[in-house]
Regions:
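Hydrophobic alpha-helical signal peptides and transmembrane signal-/tail-anchor segments
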Residues: 1-11
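Conserved core of the sugar-phosphate nucleotidyltransferase
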Residues: 142-262, 282
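Short beta-strand segments
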Residues: 29-31, 80, 131-134, 164-168, ...
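General beta-strand structural signal in soluble alpha/beta enzymes
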Residues: 79, 102-103, 132, 163-165, ...
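Left-handed beta-helix
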Residues: 12, 17-24, 225-338
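Conserved N-terminal catalytic core of the sugar/cofactor nucleotidyltransferase
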Residues: 9, 15-29, 37-44, 55-134, ...
């Protein structure tokens, strides 16, 4: 009886500690991209993150949300998007509160988006650790992904640094960014030596053969203090005005202020605006079956091939002497490919 009571209490304490730990962890899903490179399936008015690309019953955005909802408290998940996609986000994620959907009035890439989200989360929880995630990635091993995310958040919680997640290249892919590993810092975490964005195929082959380069997944982590200091230093026009104009903004005031001032913010990615200009940047070696749905070529390379080395995505087709194609048809359509 006493042993059972002890085990019960031990389990309860562990659950409470785990809950307390993850309460400081936040995710911001970046869902404002136009998805032009996957035309005609993805179009500016309805880009790829809002499409059920593989016939799974969920769009890429919904899959991303559910992936993080298994790791973090749902109330700690935010979505950043463009005002043109606000209704799509609300339709596809009705469980997300309005004040957790941050809609920009104009496209300004990911750095201003992340700075704004950092400002909002900092006012909610000044001890938060944050992961920024694209909304259009494929993850084959969700258990490994969960483990890597938790380990990454624990690392940045304890260290004032920026952390990106890297995966080992499986092919010389010119459409991805590459991270060169430097000195080892802890377990699978290394200092970043350099970033290279979309090299040509010859250099991508050299990178892969060297073993020193990993693909950049676009997953970025840091504690809120480190993110805030980095954005304040490198993108001062974004955060400084938000805090100095009126640090006690309500959500509505903040949204109105951003609507008025966002067009003046620089058009810059997190990679170029923050990571490549910072000294304290690290990369974690990860292996969770990652693929980026950026281009038709990257999809072809990542997907399993069928007859004639064709990739057929949720489509009804008849193939006749066809090789090396990516085929995705609108629902209800049939095609003969020759």
């Amino acid at each position: 009886m006493a042993l059972s009571f002890f085990i019960c209490n031990f389990v309860n304490v562990k659950i409470m500690n785990d809950m307390k730990e993850t309460n400081n962890y936040y995710c911001v899903i970046l869902a404002g991209g136009k998805g032009r490179r996957l035309w005609p399936t993805s179009r500016e008015q309805h880009p790829k993150q809002f499409i059920d690309f593989f016939g799974s019953g969920q769009t890429q955005l919904q899959q991303t949300y559910e992936r993080f909802a298994k790791i973090l408290p749902k109330e700690n998940i935010f979505v950043n998007t463009n005002i043109n996609y606000l209704n799509l986000v609300k339709e596809q994620l009705p469980q997300v509160a309005d004040d957790h959907i941050m809609a920009e009035p104009i496209h300004r890439n990911t750095a201003p988006s992340a700075a704004w989200a950092t400002h909002r989360i900092r006012h909610i929880n000044p001890t938060a650790s944050i992961i920024f995630s694209p909304s259009d990635q494929t993850v084959m091993n969700e258990e490994a992904f969960k483990q890597n995310v938790i380990e990454g958040l624990q690392f940045v919680e304890e260290n004032d640094c920026l952390l990106t997640m890297g995966v080992k290249p499986t092919r010389p892919e010119p459409g991805y960014g590459y991270i060169q590993l430097g000195e080892r810092a802890a377990n699978d975490v290394y200092k970043v030596q350099s970033f290279t964005e979309k090299p040509d195929r010859e250099f991508a082959q050299v990178f892969m053969d060297s073993g020193e380069f990993y693909w950049n997944t676009g997953l970025f982590l840091a504690n809120v203090h480190c993110f805030y200091e980095s954005f304040s230093k490198l993108l001062p026009t974004v955060l400084r005005k938000l805090d100095t104009e009126n640090p006690s903004f309500s959500i509505e005031d903040e949204d109105n202020y951003v609507k008025e001032n966002f067009p003046s913010y620089p058009n810059m990615s997190i990679d170029h605006g923050i990571l490549e200009k910072s000294e304290n940047v690290y990369v974690m070696k990860c292996d969770f079956g990652w693929a980026d749905l950026g281009t038709w070529h990257s999809i072809y390379e990542a997907m399993q091939k069928g007859e004639g080395d064709n990739v057929v995505i949720d489509s009804d087709v008849i193939l006749d002497n066809s090789h090396g194609n990516v085929i995705k048809l609108p629902e209800g359509r049939m095609a003969v490919i020759n």
